[in-house]
Amino acid sequence: DCTILGAGGAAKAIAYALTTSNVKSISIINRSQENANQLSQWIQNNSNIRVTTTTPEHLSAVADLFINCTPLGMWPDTEQIPMNMDLVNNNHILVDTIYNPIETQWLKSGNAKGAKTIGGLDMFIAQGLASADIWFGKKISNQINVDIIRQILIEGKRFKRFPSIHFP
């Protein structure tokens, strides 16, 4: 079972990826029930996955995987978290789409409770590579060393300001 926190553009991209996986059910948690219902309908139109929607106040710990697609915890409001951490334990996986900071307070709290956590930096890099393919009109992303990009970004003062990368 998977829970998507949020129902915007990032949530739709995550939902698309989940529809191509072996996920059996998705729960969408969003402040706006209308947006959650729209995403739910999109998933149901494109898959056979069971989908439920609710608001953050009614979130439960039923899911194995929680994916944060909200801006909660993003710089400069880094202390915000998208869910009640009393629901998290060492059986959960927390995935954050936020890349600034690299490790959000939500992920730190999840780590402290023994959950497996995954930050949003790799998704950020993948978006950039996909954009480069579009900009250059050909697939150049497979020629780029992702490890170097990741290292540059990690060493870039934790994104307080993005490092200046100059192209020759």
Predicted regions and their residues:
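Rossmann-like NAD(P)-binding element
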Residues: 32, 58-81, 95
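NAD(P)-binding Rossmann-fold cofactor-contacting core
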Residues: 21-46
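Conserved S-adenosyl-L-methionine
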Residues: 20-25, 112-116
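A short, charged, Gly/Pro-tolerant segment at domain boundaries
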Residues: 142-168
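Rossmann-fold NAD(P)-binding glycine/threonine-rich loop
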Residues: 84, 90-142, 148
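Hydrophobic Val/Ile/Leu positions in short beta-strands of Rossmann-like dinucleotide-binding domains
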Residues: 4-5, 28, 96
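Short acidic low-complexity segments
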Residues: 49-63, 86
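Glycine-rich adenosine-cofactor-binding loop
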Residues: 1-19
